[in-house]
Each structure stands twice: as C-alpha cells, then as structure tokens.
Amino acid sequence: MPRCNRALAGLACAVCLAAQPKPEELPVFRSDTRLVVLHATVVDRSGNLVTTLAQKSFKVYENGVEQPIKVFKREDIPVAMGLIIDNSGSMRNKRLKVEAAALQLVKASNPDDEVFVVNFNDEAYLDQPFTGDIKLLEQSLAKIDSRGGTAMRDAVRMSIDYLKESAKKDKKVLLVVTDGNDNNSTGTLENLVKAAQQSEVLIYAIGLLNEEERREARRAKRELDAIAEASGGQSYYPKELAEVDKIATQVAHDIRSQYVIAYTPINQVLDGSFRQVRVMVNAPNKPVARTRSGYYATPDIAPKAARPKTAFR
C-alpha cells in the first residue's frame, strides 16, 4: 500500500454572491447553545449544483423529527483547508500531477483561505502549517519521499485535530489523495468517522486506485467513502490520472456553493447518543442535499481514543 504523504492544503469554500458585504462568522456548535451547523451541497438529478434556493425549500430532521432552522445563508466564506497527500512508493509517478491539481484547488479558492499540507506514508508529517502563501504550499507539496506503506487514517485524524487546535476559520475542509489501502494506521475507521462527524470537517477524497488489485481497491474505496459520506464531503475515483485537475476544480466549486444551515436541537439531552441528521429539499427537478450524516450529543465532542501526534519535519 502506498505510504501517505500528509499533504493537507487548504480548500476554499463558501458561495459567492456578487456585491455582498463581508461574510459574518459562522455559528459554532457548543454544549451551552447546542447549535448544530450544517454545510449542505445541493445538486439536481444530473449532478449540477443548485445555488439559488430560499430557506423555505429546506427542512432539517434530527432522528426523524423536524427541527426549526435558526440560521440560513449562502455566502463565500473563507475556509481552513488541509491537503493530505499520499507519499508512498506507488505514488512516485503520480505526485507531480497530484501536486498541480492541489495547487489549482487552492488558487480557485477564496483568497482569504488558510491552508496547510500533510504528506504521509508510514507516518504523517505536517510539512506546512497554515498559510496563505502559494509559494510555501508549492514547496511543501514538492517534499517527495515516495516510499513505504500507507497510514491514511492517522494522517486524516492528525489533520482533524490540527484543524480543531489551530484553525482561525469556522468552516473546515480536508482533501485526501491516495492510491491504496491503509496498511499502517493505528487508529480505526470507526473512530475516524466519529471524529469527522463531531468536528464539522468536510472531507473530500480522491482515490487513484489500482483496479488490478481488486481486494485492496475495494477496501480503500470503502474507507474513503465512509469518511467522505459521514462528513458531508464527496469521494472521487478517476479512471485516468489526467482527470485529477478537473476533480480539483469540481471540489472547489462544491465547497463554494454550499448552504449554511444551523438549528438548535429540540432534544437538548447530552446523553452521548448519535443523532442522525437529514436535510430535505422541496424544489423543482427534485434536487437533493448532501451534508454530514449526524453528530454525537455530548459536550466532549472528541472520541476518547489514541490519536496520532502532529509531526513536523
């Protein structure tokens, strides 16, 4: 399996409306206010983004019970973005194309975004802390040491923790690029999914999987799908390496075209249970909304599990 080169580079998100005032900060989920914030992407049956809907078109359900919407807006909100890049041996001939796509994503994002880079193989390394300097991001992405195995889950978990500790923006996004199944992480998929749901981080994944290794590819796809779907992001599996640029642009558009929806749960009990969340859309052509699948109702939003420490080099 490819060793993951931890390269998390910032994703720019939020939806731009012409001549709008500077966006306000997003509401934050806290145990006292119990405000749950959702970032929802809406697409029609052809997969095209739908960006002109009003609040009346949306309904939010928690465990099947409709919730009153407290905040609804669509703005180009700067994000805290991480690029997590596989740097295992099998990525050696793919890195240059992947790096170019990652930089294109950053350039297509909000200029006020903050971005960091994580490269990973057997271990994950924070090669560039938060920055808005495209040259520094380019240098960190170029730290190629393609060898060893793949610790994708640990790289993503480390990146989630880094976002929680260091991000100055409320909206948080990760892009993971890997070409193989995780074979070196200490953390489990279950705990990673929990962390993603609790952190409000949108996770996008690009899997450059080898179809000749079908069993390995299926395992890798299952993990990438799980973390992307749980967080409200999306996973992509290009058939050709040349498609990565197009996917990066698509991810940028997705992030910048999302609705911000927040509600105060009717059920205020902090019992640690999982609360399933669904956003339903009533509009012509039957569009559908994609957002995180739920959250855990506990003041301590971090699952109690061993976490990989942030490593610098």
Predicted region positions:
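Bacterial N-terminal signal peptides that target proteins for export
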Residues: 1-11
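Hydrophobic h-region of N-terminal signal peptides that target proteins for export
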Residues: 10-20
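Scaffold/interface architecture of coatomer-like assemblies
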Residues: 19-313
